[in-house]
């Protein structure tokens, strides 16, 4: 791996719904040999379970936190070394949101999902309607990250296209314990 691997030990990935945070975070964590923390799987935002799970997961040494740590900034940001902002254009976010909603609408039912649940993806967080409703707000919010008091001294990397993000990830080199091709 090129670069200072210890700099990339504790990372938060942010971006609008549909930017590809989960997929990118999983790839980055694998590349760095770090734990991938998928915020949306830690429980309802702000719940006791969510707060306890976030605190426990960021106590580790190497992790990639997928999504902004709402309600837990005071715990997550002081431990963070790098914030990666996937700042993609509105049309890409909309296209990805529509594709995701279509996959979830016409694809196989998820465990515990009823037929009526299929259409909630169009208006749910991460769906195209929600993504467009919060696009400008989230971009402004993430644009203020450099001034967040909990992130003083933290490196903020901002990628404007998926190709720039992929090139940066490729430049990190091979995942630990894997043969270089």
Task: For each feature predicted by the language model, list its residue ranges.
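NTP-dependent small-molecule kinase module
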Residues: 2-6, 129-181
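Conserved nucleotide-sensing/catalytic segment adjacent to the nucleotide-binding pocket
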Residues: 34-91
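Hydrophobic anchor at the beta1->P-loop junction of P-loop NTPases
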Residues: 13
């Amino acid at each position: 791996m090129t670069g200072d691997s210890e700099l990339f030990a504790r990372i938060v990935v942010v971006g609008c719904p549909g930017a590809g945070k989960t997929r990118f975070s999983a790839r980055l964590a694998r590349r760095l040999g770090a734990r991938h923390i998928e915020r949306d799987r830690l429980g309802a935002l702000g719940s006791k379970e969510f707060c306890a799970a976030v605190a426990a997961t960021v106590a580790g040494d190497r992790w990639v936190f997928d999504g902004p740590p709402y309600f837990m900034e005071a715990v997550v940001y002081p431990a963070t070394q790098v914030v990666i902002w996937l700042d993609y254009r509105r049309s890409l976010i909309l296209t990805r949101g529509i594709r995701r909603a279509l996959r979830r609408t016409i694809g196989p039912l998820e465990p515990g999902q009823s037929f009526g649940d299929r259409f909630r993806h169009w208006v749910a967080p991460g769906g195209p309607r929600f993504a467009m409703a919060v696009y400008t707000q989230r971009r402004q919010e993430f644009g203020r990250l450099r001034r967040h008091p909990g992130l003083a001294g933290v490196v903020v990397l901002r990628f404007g296209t998926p190709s720039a993000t992929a090139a940066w990830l490729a430049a990190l080199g091979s995942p630990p314990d894997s043969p270089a091709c």
